[in-house]
Regions:
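Catalytic alpha/beta core domains of metabolic enzymes, predominantly
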Residues: 84-218, 222, 227-233
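Domain-level signature for soluble enzymes in the chorismate/prephenate branch of the shikimate pathway
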Residues: 228-322
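Non-catalytic positions within long, well-ordered alpha-helices that form the structural scaffold/packing
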Residues: 5-8, 65, 120, 185
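Glycine-rich, proline-tolerant flexible connector loops at the mouths of alpha/beta enzymes
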Residues: 16-35, 198-207, 263-272
Length: 322
């Protein structure tokens, strides 16, 4: 209650708490279950905030609705399982409650969209998505890799879908929350879900990624909220330049692929394999060096030429197998 009261005083409108917490391994804190639902009722009554919790089974849905939980969300482990999602969707038939769906643990946009569609087809119209990052072996900086291109593509495909960001789970460390919050706002996310605790180091789960209500209030006060819809003449001129450059790029790629097909024909006539590893490594090395001189990241350059090479191989295989 102390945390809830402090957050309400800071102007927060929605209090989210995990009643059931699926853990990667057994033995950790997995939530207090049904006995904690009256605690959320008390938060709602005493602070006026809306309350929300995660549901993973039809039984969770039934109990959450029984205790008048205002908003439900589906966690990353559940959204990755179509069987679990369909069971949740069936339990939500005819229920008028907002539902947010977190991205699956693995970076699979179609799986995320499928989870959202199942809930929507159950008749839930107040639907949103939560971006909490994606699991990766590389945890040098983030607990979960942001991979911003995936929620951006989700927004492109479903423009009306509200998407909020969970910087706590992406960062995994409290010092990363502020910059991640700002990046989410810069990308046009509709909101944030940030973990807070009156005594973060004493939290029963994910203590390292929690901040006090005072720190949260300070982080939010520093956010720069940009106007997505404001367009000035200057940016339209620059966008026209981008369009012209993109046209040039497409023409150059088409020309490159024509040469690749000629190479494919040569390989066929001389009984050569399509994949020439030494040549591919040479291209990556040279283009990476060129990219660095042009101010491009090595990762971006490698990614671009990996895609180009994949398309080249595909077209050459077609020629060889004709």
């Amino acid at each position: 209650m102390t945390t809830a009261q402090q957050l309400a005083m800071k102007g927060c409108h929605n209090f989210r708490a995990g009643i059931w917490k699926p853990r990667t391994k057994p033995g950790g804190f997995e939530g207090n279950g049904e006995k904690a639902l009256p605690w959320l009722q008390r938060v709602k009554k005493e602070t006026g905030m809306l309350v929300s919790t995660e549901v993973a089974t039809p039984e969770h849905v039934e109990l959450a609705l029984k205790y008048d939980i205002d908003i439900l969300w589906v966690g990353a482990r559940t959204s990755a399982n179509p069987f679990a999602m369909q069971a949740l969707a069936d339990s939500l038939q005819g229920v008028d409650v907002p539902v947010f769906v977190k991205n699956p643990v693995n970076p699979d946009l179609e799986l995320w969209i499928g989870a959202l569609e199942r809930i929507n087809q159950a008749g839930v119209k107040r639907l949103g998505a939560i971006h909490r990052g994606f699991s990766s072996y590389d945890k040098k900086i983030y607990r979960n890799m942001p991979m911003w291109q995936i929620p951006i593509e989700l927004k492109r495909r479903i423009p009306s879908l509200p998407i909020i960001c969970d910087p706590s789970h992406i960062g995994g460390r409290r010092e990363l929350i502020a910059p991640l919050c700002q990046q989410a706002m810069d990308l046009g996310f509709e909101g944030l879900i940030v973990e807070s605790h009156c005594s973060p180091d004493e939290a029963w789960s994910d203590a390292k990624q929690q901040v006090t209500p005072d720190v949260l209030d300070y982080i939010l006060s520093l956010l720069v909220i940009r106007d997505e819809k404001t367009t000035v003449e200057g940016i339209q001129t620059l966008r026209k330049q981008i369009d012209e450059l993109d046209n040039e790029l497409m023409n150059l790629l088409a020309k490159r692929m024509r040469v690749c097909r000629e190479i494919g024909q040569y390989k066929k006539e001389h009984n050569m394999t399509v994949l020439q590893t030494n040549r591919y490594n040479e291209i990556l090395e040279k283009r990476g060096a060129q990219g660095a001189l042009c101010g491009l990241s090595a990762k971006s350059v490698a990614s671009i030429f990996e895609e180009i090479h994949e398309e080249s191989v595909r077209q050459q295989l077609e020629i060889i197998n004709q």
